[in-house]
């Protein structure tokens, strides 16, 4: 069986953010403070049309022998897929206190109010409204070991509205939780070369988890998970190795599990690495060449309800190599060529109840002009 559909819609978004920042003296030391506020509004309206069959399913025969051709089915009339009016306003403040020459304390808080008026998926005659608000404090302590090295610890509260729906077509409650982080940072040669190493732990409730089942409208059904814990480590190195040669390297490793020890979001890689470099030719300074590789480990999804019952879709670890060259024709005008997926690696960019192939080898050329 195959699944298809037409979608159309529009999104309009407006946002404003304003803040004041300044310094002040207290107890003979210089400190900093900031106050601000923001408001955003987003309006979405989407319709869809499907083949006139159950959930848009069309018989394509044996998919192993299918060549991609199929007769144009009878399409259903356009109907409402989703219609939302989302407003979010916030007020925030932060301060950086100099406790001693090497020691700084950072304190802050944000108040957020989130309001959404929407139609449950596939229910054009039902209008719902939900308003949530929360205060999210954060704090950090930074200690300068010497001119090059510093260490820090931080705490942040989490309040994150979601755009996923449950089986009734209602939006899930915002994700809430706490985040803890500690690390070291260093910079050398007047910040020409920087590096950082951090460990983190994130505790969350109301985390959206895809059930890989669908509403009659075709929209995915999600459920909320409580007691989700993510913990891991990050490393990054950025800088200029010479006047003409720049390098970036980063690596992340983490695990995420629910309160029962089950993997959460297993369709996202647990280990990632990136290496990117660029070089400006000394004999032809207008030309810059570079490239890099992005690598990730295996991802998978367990799906219920298939012809064979429970099944697993997975993508093994892989790396993608990309190249670029940029020529500065004039001070304002430049031309750039990009080669993505240099070795034409075949891979799945998404794994779930279906899979989506990643982009094959492709080349693009662009021009830019700075005024």
Question: How does the language model describe each region?
Answer:
Residues 12-18, 87-93, 135-141, 168, ...:
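Hydrophobic, lipid-facing positions within transmembrane beta-strands of outer-membrane proteins
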């Amino acid at each position: 069986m195959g699944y298809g559909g037409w979608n159309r819609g529009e999104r309009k978004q407006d946002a404003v953010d304003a803040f004041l920042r300044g310094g002040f003296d207290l107890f003979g030391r210089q400190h900093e403070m900031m106050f601000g506020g923001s408001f955003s509004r987003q309006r979405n309206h989407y319709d869809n049309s499907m083949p006139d069959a159950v959930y848009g399913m069309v018989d394509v025969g044996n998919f192993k022998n299918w060549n991609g051709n199929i007769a144009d089915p009878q399409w259903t009339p356009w109907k409402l897929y989703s219609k939302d009016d989302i407003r979010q306003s916030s007020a925030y403040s932060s301060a950086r206190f100099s406790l001693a020459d090497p020691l700084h304390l950072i304190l802050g808080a944000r108040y957020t109010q989130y309001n959404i008026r929407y139609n449950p998926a596939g229910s054009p005659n039902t209008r719902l409204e939900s308003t949530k608000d929360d205060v999210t404090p954060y704090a950090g302590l930074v200690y300068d070991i010497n001119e090059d090295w510093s260490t820090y610890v931080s705490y942040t509260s989490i309040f994150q509205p979601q755009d996923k729906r449950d089986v009734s077509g209602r939006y899930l409650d915002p994700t809430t939780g706490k985040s803890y982080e500690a690390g070291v940072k260093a910079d050398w040669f007047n910040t020409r070369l920087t590096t950082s190493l951090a460990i983190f732990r994130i505790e969350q409730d109301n985390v959206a988890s895809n059930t890989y089942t669908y509403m009659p409208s075709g929209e995915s059904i999600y459920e909320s998970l409580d007691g989700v814990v993510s913990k891991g480590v990050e490393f990054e190195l950025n800088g200029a190795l010479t006047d003409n040669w720049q390098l970036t390297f980063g690596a992340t490793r983490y695990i995420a599990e629910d309160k029962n020890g089950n993997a959460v979001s297993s369709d996202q890689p647990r280990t990632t690495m990136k290496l990117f470099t660029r070089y400006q030719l000394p004999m032809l300074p207008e030309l810059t060449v570079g490239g890099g590789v992005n690598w990730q480990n295996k991802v998978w999804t367990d799906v219920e309800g298939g012809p064979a019952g429970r099944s697993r879709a997975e993508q093994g670890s892989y790396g993608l190599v990309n190249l670029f060259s940029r020529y500065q024709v004039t001070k304002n005008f430049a031309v750039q060529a990009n080669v993505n997926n240099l070795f034409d690696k075949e891979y799945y960019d998404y794994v779930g109840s279906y899979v989506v192939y990643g982009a094959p080898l492709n080349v693009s050329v662009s021009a830019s002009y700075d005024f």
